[in-house]
């Protein structure tokens, strides 16, 4: 099947995974990490418990990161927002999965799963 006829596979998270999904705009692959990692309104205590951060574009997981640390940004334009530092999860099965059911009609770009 191709195009709009493709069946989207829903994300079925591992129960042990603590996931933060963040919606990012359509970006070039080389910019995806930077777009995913910073300037989020999150509860930093809760965010630090996350085992995975998923980059979401149009409801689909584009990349998965393992966060190493979260901190409040030093950027004066984004006071009170958080950013993480992490690495790509090379063993993930989440890429290409649909997360639309987790967001519903929510406009919030951040979604917590299993947290």
Describe each region flagged by the PLM:
Residues 1-61, 91-115:
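Compositionally biased, charged N-terminal/linker segments
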Residues 62-72:
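Short beta-strand-centered aromatic/proline hotspots
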Residues 66, 76-77, 97-98:
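Short conserved micro-motifs at the rims of enzyme active sites and ligand-binding pockets
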Residues 72-87:
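Short, solvent-exposed secondary-structure boundary/capping segments
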